Structures are given as structure tokens and as C-alpha cells.
């Protein structure tokens, strides 16, 4: 499941802030919602996020083994059978800094292209974001849709319940510069 993807994308929207100093990410949460047949929905989240920056991009990495859907057996199946976390322990999103231009204060919304790596396969991703800048603190709300089949993840199903291929990934971050 492409749950971890969300955390990565929002951090990328902070490139304009780096000129003012280093960034510290706090209160970061990445969540996912996977919908299935028969009205089924599976939600999960993690707060384990690592952000790296170079001259051209932000790279956000999440340990896929930290995802928690509040149901131990389901988590075990997701991590072992579908995400194969021993073989693919992380998911990564990379966003180009050139796309990001946050104001010194106020709000901004937009979309940025990037790449998302899950299950060892890297594919394009478009991240929608909203940012609120107040002094040295920026709150970011970002999301994108991850497609399991594009990342080589087999159809997710348990008994008669099947999960749709599109998984919504969402991240909320507070960043201080």
C-alpha cells in the first residue's frame, strides 16, 4: 500500500524557506486511505519521517514498517505480503525545489510534480499542497494518489474484500526554519 508516500510530498513544498536557514520538521503525520468493495475502508498512519535536501530537491523517506492501521493482523499482511517491507523497507518521494515558492507569510496552494518510489519502483507523482506561513513556522497539508499496480503491488484482497488500486496519501507537517 502506498501509505508512506504522503509524508514525503509535503516537505518538498518548503524549498523557498531554505534560503532563510535550516528546516526542522515536527508534528509530521502521513496517513493513507484505501477503499474497497462492500463499503470497506482501511486507514493508517505513521509519524516516522526523514527529510533530506540538496541543491535541487527535497527527498522524504518513510519506513514502511512503521505504518499502523490499528489492526495488528491487517498490518502484518500489508507489510509482509503486499509492501514486502523486509525487501523494500522505505518509500520515497522526491520533489524539485524549483516548483516551490512560498511567501514570507500568508497562504499558498498548488501542485508540484515529483517521483514516488514504493516497492522498489519509481513513478511520477503529482502532489497537491496547501501551506500557511507565519514567521518561522510553516504548516503544510499535502496529498496525492498512489497507484498500487504501477508499483508492482499485487491486488490487495482478504477473503471477499478487495482494495481498489488507488490509495489516497495525505501528510500534515509543521516545519520551523
Label for each model-derived stretch:
Residues 19-177:
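Low-complexity, acidic/polar, glycine-enriched regions of mature
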Residues 1-9:
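Bacterial N-terminal signal peptides that target proteins for export
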Residues 8-18:
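Bacterial N-terminal signal peptides
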Amino acid at each position: 500500500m502506498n501509505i508512506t508516500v504522503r509524508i514525503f510530498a509535503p516537505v518538498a513544498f518548503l524549498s523557498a524557506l531554505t534560503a532563510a536557514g535550516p528546516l526542522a520538521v515536527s508534528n509530521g503525520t502521513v496517513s493513507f486511505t484505501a477503499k474497497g468493495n462492500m463499503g470497506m475502508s482501511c486507514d493508517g498512519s505513521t509519524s516516522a519521517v526523514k527529510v533530506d535536501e540538496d541543491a535541487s530537491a527535497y527527498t522524504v523517506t518513510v519506513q514502511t514498517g512503521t505504518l499502523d492501521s490499528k489492526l495488528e493482523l491487517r498490518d502484518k499482511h500489508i507489510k509482509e505480503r503486499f509492501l514486502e517491507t523486509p525487501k523494500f523497507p522505505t518509500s520515497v518521494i522526491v520533489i524539485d525545489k524549483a516548483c516551490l515558492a512560498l511567501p514570507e507569510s500568508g497562504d499558498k496552494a498548488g501542485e508540484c510534480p515529483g517521483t514516488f518510489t514504493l516497492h522498489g519502483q519509481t513513478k511520477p507523482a503529482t502532489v497537491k499542497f496547501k501551506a500557511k506561513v507565519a514567521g518561522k513556522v510553516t504548516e503544510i497539508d499535502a496529498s496525492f494518489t498512489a497507484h498500487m499496480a504501477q508499483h508492482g503491488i499485487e491486488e490487495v484482497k482478504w477473503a471477499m474484500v478487495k482494495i481498489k488500486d488507488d490509495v489516497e496519501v495525505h501528510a500534515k507537517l509543521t516545519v520551523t526554519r
